[in-house]
Amino acid sequence: MSDSSSRERALAVQAFDEWPPVLRALFDGTGLAGKEGFTACLVVADADAQGPLRTSLLSAGELYAPDSRSLAFALWPAARAARMLDAAARRGSGRAALTFVHEGAFYQVQLRVDALEVEEGGPLACFIASIDSADAQQVGYAKLTSGITFELQSQQRQAVIDRWQQQIERLRRAVASRSQADGGAASP
């Protein structure tokens, strides 16, 4: 095996504990129509590690990075992952993994999660997480072109994008409110 073929087959892993600029831009809550097909997978384990793992698929309209080390996200309150995270966060043990494909790399981000208070009557369960550890993985011989993706139905596309923008605004307000209450810190 030659040196060049070894390099092509080698797994390149880039560890990070802050969002790289390309991911900050992905999770900045702007230009949601252009991020329509993006999907991230949130994997949540039961706090006692005895129950099944739960997975939620999240769009760019449900993810917001208020700073370089945090991620706010919204789930439907009836989702099992939301209920598990809420219970674990109340015990101080909320943990999840966010996985996704972006620009040819597979990302896996380990998160410490806390519940995020939102205005009364909000339709979503909101959370704030800090990056515990993360990495991006690529190989030289193959480029990931997509992970799980979706396409909005044309007759509902604008309504969904408008809803995403409202969700991001709720997350922004909740993060700002928490940050003020904590004296400027957004992370759990």
PLM region spans:
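Binding-site signature for planar aromatic cofactors or substrates
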Residues: 1-188
